[in-house]
Amino acid sequence: MNEIYLIGLGNPGKKYSNSRHNIGFLLLENLSKKYNSSFLLKDKLKSFYSEFKANDSTYRLFLPNTFMNNSGEAVLAILDWYKINLNQIFVIVDDKDLPLGKIRFRKKGSSGGHNGLKSIIEKLQTHDFNRIRIGIGSPPSTKETNNFNTISHVLGNISREEKSILDKVYVRVIESLEQLNTKKEEYIINKLNSFDIEQI
C-alpha cells in the first residue's frame, strides 16, 4: 500500500489555533476529521500524529510540536524514523505573498521568507521537497510608515470572511491529496495551481 506523508506547519497551542500562520495545521485537522481520525502527540516524531487509509493509500499526518521556527527538527525526526525519501513528504504552509485563496504546488524552492520552510531547508540541507503553499494575502500597510506589519498579520486570527474563502481552499487541497495515488502528478499540480476562488 502506498504511503503518503503530509506535514502541516503551524504553532502548537490554543493561542495560535486560529491564526493565519496555522493554515497547515488547520487543513490537516480538517482532513483528519473527515476520516474520523484524531491527532496524538508522538514525542519521537516531535509532532502530533494522525493516520487513516483511503484510496489504497495510508495517509500519515503530522503537526510539528516544535513551534514554527523549529519545524525542521520535526521533519528530520519524521524522515529518520520512517526511513523515507524526501519526495514522499508534502509540506503544507501559509504564504503571505500569495493572494488569499490562491494555491501553489512546488517541488522545490526557497523559503520565501517563511521561517518554517527556512528551518526545514536548514535542517535537511536542501530546497528539494514538495510544498503546497496557501495564500493568506499581504498584511495591510500603516499610513504612518507605509510598512507591512507582517508578524501581527500572520499571527492574527482568521476572520469570518477569510474563513469562508479558506474553507473552499481546504476542499480543493484535500480533494487533490486524496488523488495523489490515483492521478498523475501533472494533474494534481494543475488542479491546485489553477484554483480560482472567483469561479467557485
Swiss-Prot record:
It holds the Pfam family Pept_tRNA_hydro. It is found in: Cytoplasm. GO terms for biological process: protein quality control for misfolded or incompletely synthesized proteins; rescue of stalled ribosome. Keywords: Cytoplasm, Hydrolase, RNA-binding, tRNA-binding. The keyword tRNA-binding applies. TRNA binds at residues 16, 67, 69, 115. Disulfide bonds: none annotated. GO terms for cellular component: cytoplasm. It catalyses: an N-acyl-L-alpha-aminoacyl-tRNA + H2O = an N-acyl-L-amino acid + a tRNA + H(+). The active site is at residue 21. The record marks 94 as: Stabilizes the basic form of H active site to accept a proton. GO terms for molecular function: peptidyl-tRNA hydrolase activity; tRNA binding. The keyword Transmembrane does not apply. SUPFAM superfamilies: Peptidyl-tRNA hydrolase-like. PROSITE patterns: PEPT_TRNA_HYDROL_2. Hydrolyzes ribosome-free peptidyl-tRNAs (with 1 or more amino acids incorporated), which drop off the ribosome during protein synthesis, or as a result of ribosome stalling. PANTHER family: PEPTIDYL-TRNA HYDROLASE (PTHR17224:SF1). Monomer. NCBIfam families: pth. Belongs to the PTH family. This is Peptidyl-tRNA hydrolase. It comes from Prochlorococcus marinus (strain MIT 9312).
